[in-house]
C-alpha cells in the first residue's frame, strides 16, 4: 500500500477590509487579508500539502502569482485542482488537518462551518477534515495581529 503525507504552510498579512476568507468561510473581521487571490490562508496551506504529498510543487507552480488571471481568484479553484490531481494520480485523500494561527478572529465558533465548506469543495466527508486554531501567545507577527498563518497536513492512500 502506498501512503503519502504532505505538509503545507502559508501566511498572509492583514490589510484593509471587513472580513477574511478562512477555509472557504467568510469570517467578519475589522481587517482583511492581503493576497494575490482571495488570501484564504487555510485553503492555501491545505492545497500546498496536497501538492507536496504528490511531489508536484506548490500553488505557485500551478497558479503563478505573476499570471493576472489569478488576481482575486477564489481559493476553491486551487483546492479543486489539487483534488483533481489526487484522483488523476490514483490516490484518495484519507484525511487532512488544518491549524490556523492567529489571535483574532476567533476560529472556534466558525470551525464547524469551515469543515463543512472544505468537505463540499473537496467532495469528502467532514469527518475526514480537522480545522482548529491556536495562538502564538502574543509572540511574532501573528501575536502582534499583523496577519494569519496556517499549517496543513494531508494523508493520501493509493486507490
Swiss-Prot record:
Question: Is-annotated flag, keyword Lyase?
Answer: yes
- So, what pathway does this thing act in? Isoprenoid biosynthesis; isopentenyl diphosphate biosynthesis via DXP pathway; isopentenyl diphosphate from 1-deoxy-D-xylulose 5-phosphate: step 4/6
> Which GO annotations describe the biological process of this protein?
isopentenyl diphosphate biosynthetic process, methylerythritol 4-phosphate pathway; terpenoid biosynthetic process
Positions of the record's site feature: Transition state stabilizer: 36, 135
Q: Name the PROSITE patterns on file.
A: ISPF
Q: What is its EC number?
A: 4.6.1.12
Cofactor names from the entry are: a divalent metal cation
Quote one Gene Ontology molecular function term.
Answer: 2-C-methyl-D-erythritol 2,4-cyclodiphosphate synthase activity
Name the record gives this protein: 2-C-methyl-D-erythritol 2,4-cyclodiphosphate synthase
- Source organism per entry reads Cereibacter sphaeroides (strain ATCC 17023 / DSM 158 / JCM 6121 / CCUG 31486 / LMG 2827 / NBRC 12203 / NCIMB 8253 / ATH 2.4.1.) (Rhodobacter sphaeroides)
